[in-house]
A protein has these predicted regions:
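Extracellular glycan-interacting surfaces
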Residues: 1-371
Length: 371
């Protein structure tokens, strides 16, 4: 069970603690500044906060004392872009605009394995994966993934350029990583990043022309998670539905949920591989809860069926949307947190059956994480 929750928002980082009377907010950190990602390193408790300051660039901060004091870390830096004899071709439906070789945002941040002290992984926009071996003091771009020829086909999903928003480190083998790209599919390495394979068999992209519907390199997984106890079981909330894999992401099967299979986020039960939670929405045109009613859907049978959970959530009309990193489950599998685009934060202590609103007046929430 985790007694601390990090909430990254458009106007700062909030830290909540579980007390005898419930979850309590403490004074905000980086007030007024957009915090795109936060991490509590499970190995040593170090906190990390990634900020996107627009014209002032991307910043990364680190705290070794629970947030009492913060120090600046290095940020990932792309190498110089090679000069080419010819300018890039103009964008076409089959050729998206070339991504810049410069950091736009830290979109995901994960600790390495338990046997890799100091190792961090950062997924970024415009699509580079970076590794730090020293707790954020320095970063190295993973060139084998960045140099894949398929990367030229990746394109932005929600942002102008593609980005890595999900990184799953296999707890049984730290050299086995799975990452998800919007829009660029799911990629895996078994050797710590030396070689990569696109593994999206079974996914489909209905937003593409029919002949490219099954193209693995342009799939749009919105969020990728794995079951901690059985990492070969993975879940994806995709632009075109919900997908589940039982063979470490090599094959995917879709699942149909009501009131919608569209959404941005998913959380996997850490102990029960058949259980996962989603937050459904209306696809494409509206991006709102179905019929203006916020619910959480839960499957406890591997996606064969879903139940809509709404006790404690606002009745219709309600237009809260939950971003990719806006839903989290703790290591017990019983406590969940959910933060919305309208600044509402809820906690459930019983696996999603009942929700309690901690605050309805926070800034728009980008990410919630226990730790």
């Amino acid at each position: 069970m985790n007694d601390r929750l990090l909430v990254a928002s458009r106007k700062g980082l909030f830290i909540l603690h579980r007390r005898a009377g419930g979850w309590q907010l403490t004074a905000p950190h980086f007030i007024g500044e957009p915090v795109s990602m936060a991490l509590a390193d499970p190995r040593d408790g170090t906190l990390y906060a990634a900020l996107n300051l627009g014209h002032f660039g991307v910043k990364l901060w680190r705290s070794r004392d629970g947030g009492a004091h913060w120090e600046a870390c290095a940020v990932p830096v792309y190498p110089p872009q090679p000069e080419t004899a010819d300018p890039p071709p103009p964008p076409t439906p089959d050729q998206p605009p070339a991504a810049p070789w410069s950091l736009q945002q830290i979109w995901s941040l994960e600790a390495g394995g338990a046997d890799e002290a100091g190792v961090l992984w950062a997924g970024t926009i415009p699509g580079g994966l970076f590794r730090s071996a020293d707790g954020g003091d320095s970063w190295t771009l993973n060139r084998p993934l960045w140099d894949r020829p398929e990367r030229a086909l990746w394109f932005g999903g929600g942002y102008d350029y593609p980005g890595i928003h999900s990184i799953c480190v296999d707890p049984r083998d730290s050299r086995h990583l799975t990452v998800a790209v919007s829009c660029g599919g799911v990629w895996q390495t078994d050797d710590g990043g030396e070689h990569w394979t696109c593994t999206t068999l079974g996914m489909h992209a209905d937003y593409m022309p029919p002949e490219r519907r099954d193209d693995p390199t342009i799939q749009d997984p919105h969020r990728l998670v794995q079951c901690a106890a059985q990492p070969e079981v993975m879940w994806v909330q995709h632009h075109n539905g919900i997908f589940r894999s039982v063979d470490a992401g090599h094959h995917w099967e879709d699942a149909v949920a009501q009131p919608s299979s569209f959404g941005f986020t998913v959380a996997a039960h850490p102990l029960r591989p058949d259980t996962a939670w989603f937050v459904p929405a209306v696809k494409d045109e509206c991006r709102i809860p179905v019929e203006g009613r916020l619910v959480v859907t839960r499957s406890r049978d591997g996606g064969a069926s879903f139940e809509a959970l709404s006790e404690g959530l606002p009745p219709a009309p309600g237009y809260d949307l939950v971003y990719r990193h806006g839903l989290a489950v703790d290591d017990s599998g019983e406590t969940l947190a959910m933060g919305s685009t309208t600044g509402a934060l809820w906690i459930s202590e019983d696996g999603g059956g009942r929700w309690q609103c901690v605050s309805a007046h926070l800034p728009p929430i980008y990410c919630v994480r226990f730790g």
